[in-house]
UniProtKB/Swiss-Prot annotation:
EC number(s) recorded for this UniProt protein: 4.1.3.27
A single BP term in Gene Ontology: L-tryptophan biosynthetic process
InterPro entries given in the database record: Anth_synth/Amidotransfase, Class_I_gatase-like, GATASE, TrpG/PapA_dom
Annotated catalytic residues: 89, 177, 179
Name of the protein in its database record: Anthranilate synthase component 2
Gene: trpG
Source organism, top-level taxon: Archaea
Residues of the Glutamine amidotransferase type-1 domain: 4-196
UniProt keyword Amino-acid biosynthesis present: yes
Residues reported to bind L-glutamine: 60-62, 93, 138-139
Pfam families: GATase (PF00117)
UniProt source species: Methanothermobacter marburgensis (strain ATCC BAA-927 / DSM 2133 / JCM 14651 / NBRC 100331 / OCM 82 / Marburg) (Methanobacterium thermoautotrophicum)
Function: Part of a heterotetrameric complex that catalyzes the two-step biosynthesis of anthranilate, an intermediate in the biosynthesis of L-tryptophan. In the first step, the glutamine-binding beta subunit (TrpG) of anthranilate synthase (AS) provides the glutamine amidotransferase activity which generates ammonia as a substrate that, along with chorismate, is used in the second step, catalyzed by the large alpha subunit of AS (TrpE) to produce anthranilate. In the absence of TrpG, TrpE can synthesize anthranilate directly from chorismate and high concentrations of ammonia.
Length: 196
């Protein structure tokens, strides 16, 4: 396995912020390279050849159910469950959907800061409970459709699922944006993921 952090870009402007934050953390850890690829510019064989140590699936517009919006991300989730994967916003919804969850439309929230209550699991180590996080989404993971293999790790007061993790695999999702300045503990959460 390569010491590579692979970020799959779902054509979102926040991807650059994720890349920058992850790069700063990795420099402090004196470890790993980071590479960004667009979700439709590579195939699964290319990703296999990279043999990444960890994968981040970025936010993006659209719906994770549609291949034209989510590209190779579903294939990557299925292929690399043996190593840490973090999905952010669209990536989070895509992970939830891949494992059998229901993703539906909710009231759009764009730039809204919410309190997030978490379960203290490894992704939230050292993070206050609750903490404040920035949300940009019109889709959400439905509470009535949580798959058996998925645990809800965090939620907002309005009931929106804000974080998930797989029961067996090191696969995680965040509905909120850890890379946003409006998520003061987002860097801590991303660092927890990168240190797993």
């Amino acid at each position: 396995m390569n010491k590579l952090i692979l970020i799959i870009d779902n054509y979102d402007s926040f991807t650059h912020n994720l890349y920058q934050m992850a790069g700063e953390i990795m420099m402090e850890m004196d470890s790993a390279d980071i590479m960004v690829v667009r979700n439709d510019e590579v195939d699964i064989d290319y990703v296999r050849g990279l043999d990444p140590e960890r994968i981040i699936i970025s936010p993006g517009p659209g719906n994770p159910i549609k291949r034209e919006d989510f590209g190779i991300c579903s294939e990557v989730i299925g292929e690399f469950t043996d190593r840490p994967i973090l999905g952010v916003c669209l990536g989070h919804q895509g992970i939830f959907h891949y494992f059998g969850g229901v993703v539906g439309y909710g009231e759009p929230v764009h730039g809204k800061i919410s309190e997030v209550f978490h379960d203290g699991s490894e992704l939230f180590r050292g993070v206050p409970n609750p903490f404040r996080a920035t949300r940009y989404h019109s889709l959400r993971c439905e509470c009535s459709g949580v798959p058996e293999d998925i645990l809800v790790s965090a939620s907002a007061p309005d009931g929106t699922i804000m974080a998930i993790r797989h029961r067996q695999y090191p696969v995680y999702g965040l509905q909120f944006h850890p890379e946003s300045a409006g998520t003061p503990h987002g860097r801590d959460i991303l660092e927890n993921f990168l240190r797993m």
